[in-house]
Amino acid sequence: MFDQATSMGDGVSEERSPLCGKSATSCSERVRDKGTRADLECSLRGHSLKDIPVTSTSSPGSSKEEVQDSQSTGEADYCRRILVRDAKGTIREIVLPKGLDLDRPKRTRTSFTAEQLYRLELEFQRCQYVVGRERTELARQLNLSETQVKVWFQNRRTKQKKDQSRDSEKRSSSTSESFATCNILRLLEQGRLLSVPAPPNLISSSQNNMGTSSGNGTNLGTSGSTSPIISTTPPGAGAFSLQVPSLAASSSPRLPTSLCFPGPLLGGLHEIPSGYGLGSSAFEPYTRLDRKDTASSKKSTS
């Protein structure tokens, strides 16, 4: 009986063994997973997250390449990073470019003495380009290096060019202004802006200081001013008389009371009444003068 049971048990075990054999690999994997989970839980309870080393599935070679790439990209992005606290108290990060060389010492500015500047200026007035042995000898005498002497001459030539260009601009502007002033003064002296242009067929024959004409006996009115009177009488024509005020007169000179142009000259008798005076502008030479007597006469007539 027991033998059959054992044999039956063996047979059952033998029959079940193929089923267990199929799932043997899966069972072993589950046991391993449970073990790793238990280990992880223990490590989490005993240590903090920062102390746990991070495992990576990449190979050592690939990890080295990634580190090199990160270093190379970091070097290409910036040269140095500086944390700065502003007035509000916030901390900001300043990223300096890679090409900025902070460790390089700054170039010191050369300060020349009065004697050195005097000698350099004398040499520059003699020759603007000092090269070769002359520059070497000058640097030795002034206790300077050849580079300092060369740089000083370069800066001095640049300064001279700037001064020359500035002087030429000032000279051109001053000459243009003086030319315009001379033109205006010449026109004023000739009386072209203040006198009435005469016809081209008139020829000046004589000057009459008494204010009388010899042609038709036309009497010209005299004024209180001392300006000369110019009288021109063409042959066979009427008299033409014009009084030109001098430039040295008062600011508002007056024309004579009557300025007559006889009929044969301009085709009729034209008079400029005494109510008109010489204006201050060249474009408006005559301006009407209002007098009190005319205003009072108008009121009396009304």
Curated annotation (Swiss-Prot):
Coiled-coil intervals: none
Portion annotated as DNA-binding: 105-164
GO annotation, biological process: brain development; central nervous system development; forebrain development; head development; neuron differentiation; regulation of transcription by RNA polymerase II; Wnt signaling pathway
Short name of any one Pfam family annotated for the protein: Homeodomain
Positions with biased composition (Basic and acidic residues): 161-172, 287-296
Amino acid composition bias (Low complexity), ranges on this chain: 204-223
UniProt subcellular location: Nucleus
Keywords associated with the record: Developmental protein, DNA-binding, Homeobox, Nucleus, Transcription, Transcription regulation, Wnt signaling pathway
Family named by the database record: Belongs to the EMX homeobox family.
Record protein name field: Ventral anterior homeobox 2a
Native organism: Xenopus laevis
